[in-house]
């Protein structure tokens, strides 16, 4: 009898949770904001699935753990500038990207297009007149600097000469000698030292055909990654090294062959097993909006949803990498027309242009508010050089037509970014976070005793730090110096605080809210190591 009661209660629990979810949705938000589904029937089914979340193991994300490289301006854009023949089109692309508020360019630096004819040969003799193979990339780097944009350089596409069998194993197959690749990435990183902020080592190594006509190989990729990491850091110790962007896939057919690959969770764990933890600063992942909107909160590791980075974060925490961030290398929804003759129609989902324009800001907003361990998010993609690929589904991720006619998503993202108030959301944020506005004389101090090796310090009275945060409580972790500060929250009365190197709870409220903070140095010194915003006191 007791067993029957237990079984009956077990069956009732999801229904009870389902009822609670319906009530909360009707009172506080729409079902779309919980499920990412637009149609009422699909919303009802999704809410029932959502009620099962508490019965699954939840990812361990450690939201208050300090994370490096997570506080940069998050708005990045994928571009194909190396494929443009006319210089004005490169310039127009970068100009429009910057005008929309994006601050990063993710751009390929193909090995086969730079060290073209043989090892150490950086001359392009494919056309007359011959020219330096660096010329095009020098122009791209200069354009980014001109418009105040940082670069993520993707280092991939080996030349045929790097393999004894040429392209027999595919044009993406790794080189026979990993040191040849190491020499190439060293050449790039040394040439652009201090000018390129970040380097991505390969792309989508967990799916076909990015590892060539052979099964994907996480251990083999890790060896390549570690070689590249060592050589990049030799050339530019300050450069940020990203893994190849892991593709979203639930597949376990390791290839080769179309639509094959290794589940990115498995691939990442096998990378860790092979020693990858010592060989990257940032985990790069692709996070497409495929079958539901980015508001989908169902936790289903067997489904490809926008929430998949939560599981990758869980793996990073389990492997001792909680201090490293995830960057989203490619993110967008596919606005393919309703034409089944288009190659791979429906393979990337299908949304309208209006939905694409709504979903992109929602994706950024969710990551900013809920995932303090996510850094740069790169929209996929700005435009293609021509419309020759309009018979392929992937073409319809574009933001702008080849003739530079903007689509609705361009205006939606421009309005979102330019209207955004940079804000600290719940989590621990480092002293270099993009939402922090320093005024007066501040310096960066390298200190192994700091949380992540550095903090910001002011010594002259009158130096200020201003920012907006959203939450219930705020804690300042200062540097080791002693001094006195004045803290003003919104239009409230300023309060004096003695700073002696210990964390200070600067603010606490009974309920979450949005608050403006101004910290002023009155005397002595003040160091800012981190700021922690709490969702609950």
Predicted regions: what they are:
Residues 1-7, 11-26:
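Short, low-complexity, charge-dense intrinsically disordered segments
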Residues 30-104, 127, 142, 233:
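N-terminal carbohydrate-binding accessory modules
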Residues 31-65, 205, 338-362, 366-443, ...:
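Aromatic-rich peripheral "rim/lid" segments of glycoside hydrolase catalytic domains that contact
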Residues 73-79, 105-107, 151-153, 199-201, ...:
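Hydrophobic faces of well-ordered beta-strands that scaffold small-molecule active sites
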Residues 84-97, 181-188, 261-273, 360-364:
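Short, acidic/polar
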Residues 100-122, 127-258, 290, 333-336:
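Substrate-binding cleft and catalytic face of glycoside hydrolase catalytic domains
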Residues 182, 217-354:
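Noncatalytic carbohydrate-binding groove/subsite architecture in carbohydrate-active enzymes
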Residues 417-537:
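Glycan-recognition surfaces in beta-rich domains, encompassing non-catalytic CBMs
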